[in-house]
Amino acid sequence: MDSNTMSSFQVDCFLWHVRKRIADQELGDAPFLDRLRRDQKSLRGRGNTLGLDIETATRAGKQIVERILEEESDEAPKMTIASVPASRYLTDMTLEEMSREWFMLMPKQKVAGSLCIRMDQAIMDKNIILKANFSVIFDRLETLILLRAFTEEGAIVGEISPLPSLPGHTDEDVKNAIGVLIGGLEWNDNTVRVSETLQRFAWRSSNEDGRPSLPPKQKRKMARTIESEV
């Protein structure tokens, strides 16, 4: 195993531990707690892939961080932090909507890069809206936390989520995944709208009412794509 891969995992484990302590003291806001929960799943997946124990890695990560802090001057961290552009966290969904369990009568699933696309193909003739929580930087989507498809009644019928074991995706990856999800839902005569936040940062090819403009040929292609993988 590459030493940089191991040390990166160890530091990530320790920093997650620090953030968990902050959350335990009720000092974290909703985006902070949301990222904490997502990163926990990611670390578990990475730990399984690398064959490393998280508790042991956390202790090793603490030693690495302490050594770096001893070497740093007081001014260096301030300069580094000031030079890094800040990302913004945008939320369409509440914590309840993000954490709610949902079930599919006719489950369909596709893995596209580091994103997992899931939908219930038993849903027909419904009005559906796509909502997402994600971060943006330089007015572009930086990291998708979770995207879900809701009916007017509030039922969850589709989802796009990052795979914990495969971190990293681009805004183009997210846009392509949204296209696949929309194509699959519209194949069953559902009407799909995209939230204003998603329209602005992740899905720009839409009509004025927020409905995505996909030609019939592309809809059929996307539907066949997701039907071919369960």
Curated annotation (Swiss-Prot):
Homodimer. Interacts with host TRIM25 (via coiled coil); this interaction specifically inhibits TRIM25 multimerization and TRIM25-mediated RIGI CARD ubiquitination. Interacts with human EIF2AK2/PKR, CPSF4, IVNS1ABP and PABPN1. One of its GO terms (biological process) is symbiont-mediated suppression of host mRNA processing. One of its GO terms (molecular function) is protein serine/threonine kinase inhibitor activity. The keyword Ubl conjugation applies. Residues 180-215 are annotated as: CPSF4-binding. It is found in: Host nucleus; Host cytoplasm. The lineage of its organism: Viruses, Riboviria, Orthornavirae, Negarnaviricota, Polyploviricotina. A motif (Nuclear localization signal) lies at residues 34-38. One of its GO terms (cellular component) is host cell cytoplasm. The keyword Cell inner membrane does not apply. Residues 206-230 are annotated as: Disordered. Residues 223-230 are annotated as: PABPN1-binding. A motif (Nuclear export signal) lies at residues 137-146. Upon interferon induction, ISGylated via host HERC5; this results in the impairment of NS1 interaction with RNA targets due to its inability to form homodimers and to interact with host EIF2AK2/PKR. Keywords: Eukaryotic host gene expression shutoff by virus, Host cytoplasm, Host gene expression shutoff by virus, Host mRNA suppression by virus, Host nucleus, Host-virus interaction, Inhibition of host innate immune response by virus, Inhibition of host interferon signaling pathway by virus, Inhibition of host PKR by virus, Inhibition of host pre-mRNA processing by virus, Inhibition of host RIG-I by virus, Inhibition of host RLR pathway by virus, Interferon antiviral system evasion, RNA-binding, Ubl conjugation, Viral immunoevasion. HAMAP family: INFV_NS1 (MF_04066). This is Non-structural protein 1. Inhibits post-transcriptional processing of cellular pre-mRNA, by binding and inhibiting two cellular proteins that are required for the 3'-end processing of cellular pre-mRNAs: the 30 kDa cleavage and polyadenylation specificity factor/CPSF4 and the poly(A)-binding protein 2/PABPN1. In turn, unprocessed 3' end pre-mRNAs accumulate in the host nucleus and are no longer exported to the cytoplasm. Cellular protein synthesis is thereby shut off very early after virus infection.
